[in-house]
A protein has these predicted regions:
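Bacterial N-terminal signal peptides that target proteins for export
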Residues: 1-8
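All-alpha RGS (Regulator of G-protein Signaling) helical domain and cognate RGS-like helical scaffolds
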Residues: 25-174
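Bacterial N-terminal signal peptides
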Residues: 8-17
């Protein structure tokens, strides 16, 4: 029943996606549905990158970006708390996603995932009514576009080889 109600809200956003595991019991409204979609995307990214780290060790950029994904999920949860929305507090995808066969394939998958994430926010942001939600989702999109996507593209250009140094991009944390 909760999935059906949430699909109505998500349908209003014309997302065309399936039911997420981070679903509120009541229809969350446009902003809430967008936050649920964002949280689900952050959870999936974290679980994917955790699988890559488990398989390949502390491979960059995954070791850096997984921490960013956790911060992003926390930001989405903070907004959902402010709006009084229910959500799955822990990541339901951890341990359920398999890492690609090679680090290069994982980096290529990261590029695709970040491009899809940017497109998700391109669809969501014009529908947002709450200024704080818009700012939060805009920052998450910025991190995907300006930090995560370039990091995965560099990984692909190196043939999946890990980079040197501590990371953090050119300007620090995201």
């Amino acid at each position: 029943m909760a999935c059906w109600k949430s699909l109505l809200a998500l349908g209003a956003l014309m997302l065309g996606g399936g039911c997420t595991n981070a679903i509120a019991a009541d229809p969350p409204g446009i902003d809430g549905a967008a936050l649920l979609q964002a949280l689900d995307d952050e959870y999936r990214a974290e679980a994917t990158y955790a699988a890559v780290i488990e398989k390949f060790g502390g491979a960059r950029p995954f070791i850096n970006i997984i921490e960013a994904e956790r911060r992003h999920a926390s930001r989405a949860k903070t907004e959902m708390d402010r709006l009084g929305l229910s959500y799955e507090a822990s990541n339901p995808y951890l341990g359920k996603i398999e890492a690609p066969a090679t680090l290069l394939a994982a980096c290529e998958q990261g590029v695709t995932a970040e491009i899809e994430n940017i497109a998700l926010y391109d669809r969501l942001l014009p529908t947002i009514q709450d200024d704080d939600v818009r700012e939060t989702l805009g920052r998450l999109q910025w991190a995907s576009r300006e930090r995560h996507l370039p990091a995965f593209q560099r990984c692909v250009s190196r043939g999946g080889q890990m980079g040197q140094g501590r990371g953090g991009g050119r300007h620090g944390r995201n």
